[in-house]
């Protein structure tokens, strides 16, 4: 049983301490209570109950707890490749939904980068694999009237909340969205997209206006990568998903950090080639790719059928079928592993 105890970075919008679990109205709040600390503890208690019942087991049950699942999985590399610990014959990770996930899309993360020649204060989001729930930019103070005139319209168009603050000799425009996992970007509201929409409508003639124009042409609010020519799909896993998780300025470079979930019949290199082709002449370049290819365990395999039958029997839902998801779980770390629960 594979689980993880690391978490995605926290935004500043928590109403309680995210690292001090708190029960409110019968629900447990804290970073990672669902992903994946709670499910991992549930599995530990389940095995403890089996042990207390004295049930005979034909196989040994092993728990593997990682702390690098949300980033680059160095924990799995260390455990299996450096320490040379034998992999289990079959496994599940309680890091998704019931009844189970038999196929996971590929995860392709990369950056779109452009050089700038002037000072620019622009930032937003926290990580590749989360929908950005905040983004802000500094603007000249002479823009105040036109910004205030358009605030309500921008909120209506983008579903973001906008705030304008006076600084010493400039204005800070902030967009607030709704965070979500990059595997399901439609469940969130991307503040970076909202901010770029607003900036693109301002009468600016500078690097910022160029960047906003690029964003709206090649990305915008589309969640399938159509503007970059990567709106791919297949019968097994559906459409590619596209998320802008972060924007930052470093060393006179503007960097957008992107996360794609790639249909299982495509390879990440195919996506890269399409993006590079479409970026030609845009002023932006493709950098720092990191690919985790898809997995697909056959529906008729013993592992899938055993877990599926267990779920159907316990829950009483004989019509439940295995699912495909864009999330990336530890199921990819092993040859015969699926995500099973815990939601």
Task: Give short role names for the model-derived ranges.
Residues 4-8, 14, 139, 168-169, ...:
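Short glycine-enriched loops at secondary-structure junctions
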């Amino acid at each position: 049983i594979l689980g993880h105890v690391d978490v995605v970075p926290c935004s500043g919008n928590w109403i309680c301490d995210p690292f001090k679990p708190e029960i409110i109205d019968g629900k447990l709040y804290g970073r990672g209570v669902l992903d994946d600390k709670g499910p991992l503890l549930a599995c530990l208690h389940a095995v403890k109950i089996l042990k207390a019942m004295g049930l005979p087991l034909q196989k040994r049950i092993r728990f593997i707890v990682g702390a690098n699942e949300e980033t680059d999985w160095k924990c799995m590399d260390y455990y299996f490749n450096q320490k040379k610990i034998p992999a289990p014959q079959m496994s599940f990770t309680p890091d998704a939904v019931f009844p189970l996930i038999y196929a996971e899309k590929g995860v392709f993360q990369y950056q779109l980068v452009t050089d700038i020649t002037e000072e620019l204060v622009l930032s937003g989001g926290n990580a590749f694999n989360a929908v950005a729930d905040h983004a802000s930019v500094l603007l000249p103070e002479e823009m105040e009237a036109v910004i205030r005139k358009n605030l309500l319209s921008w909120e209506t168009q983008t579903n973001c909340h906008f705030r304008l603050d006076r600084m010493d000799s400039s204005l800070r425009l902030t967009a607030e969205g709704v965070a979500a996992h990059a595997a399901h970007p439609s469940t969130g509201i991307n503040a970076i997209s909202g901010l770029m929409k607003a900036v693109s409508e301002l009468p600016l003639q500078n690097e910022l206006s160029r960047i906003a124009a690029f964003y709206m042409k090649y990305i915008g609010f589309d969640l399938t990568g159509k503007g970059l020519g990567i709106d791919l799909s297949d019968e097994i896993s559906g459409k590619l998903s596209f998320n802008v998780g972060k924007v930052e300025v470093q060393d006179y470079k503007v960097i957008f950090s992107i996360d794609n979930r790639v249909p299982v019949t495509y390879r990440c290199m195919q996506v890269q080639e399409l993006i590079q082709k479409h970026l030609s002449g845009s002023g932006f370049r493709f950098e720092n790719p990191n690919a985790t290819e898809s997995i697909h365990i056959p529906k008729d395999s013993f592992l899938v059928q055993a877990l599926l039958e267990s779920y159907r029997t316990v829950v009483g839902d004989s019509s439940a079928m295995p699912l495909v998801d864009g999330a990336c779980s530890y199921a990819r770390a092993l040859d015969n592993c699926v995500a099973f629960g815990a939601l």
